[in-house]
Amino acid sequence: VRTNQKNLIQVINITKCNKTAAGKIYKSNARYVLNNLDYAIKQTLHNKRTALVTGPLNKEIIISIDKKFTGHTEYIQKITKSNGVLMMLASDQLRVALATTHIPIKDVAKTITKELIINKVKILNNDLKTKFNIKNPHIKVLGLNPHAGENGKIGSEELLHIKPALMNLRKKNINISMPLSADTAFSKKNLKETDAFL
């Protein structure tokens, strides 16, 4: 086994997996899967690794031994005792962060609060600066409702929660848009001038 080196991705083979076949779910391996995730988190926390890359896992088998498991993001937050986490999907052309994760669609609107938006944008802004070396990130926020609520005509979340959060963040000199309509947010112009979307 090689030690941690720059420009090296180390793949660690952890044994004790029950026999498997591709395309089949084995609840008997739930503990094995969770132990692998725990090991990877521990290695990263103790600075033995510089990053953690997770592959997909079957939530159904994990839930068989941990009823509160909803996904990597929330699990890592629990293990690390972090105040806040943010899931971001990133490529060279596009970065999209999620305000909510792993909850039923019926619960999304009541989960969107001023505090949640402020917390997520602060994490996003900080990570764009520290992890992506962007000095003054430009962040655009999508509305929750069609056409960003049309000033309260198609839902009130933008007026009650999202806009007040964004006004608060602007006072802290965070370069952020007001809520955009999701159907037009990813225009060529917006893609060119935006470092990340929430």
Feature-to-residue mapping (PLM):
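Anion-binding alpha/beta catalytic cores of soluble intermediary-metabolism enzymes, centered on
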Residues: 1-197
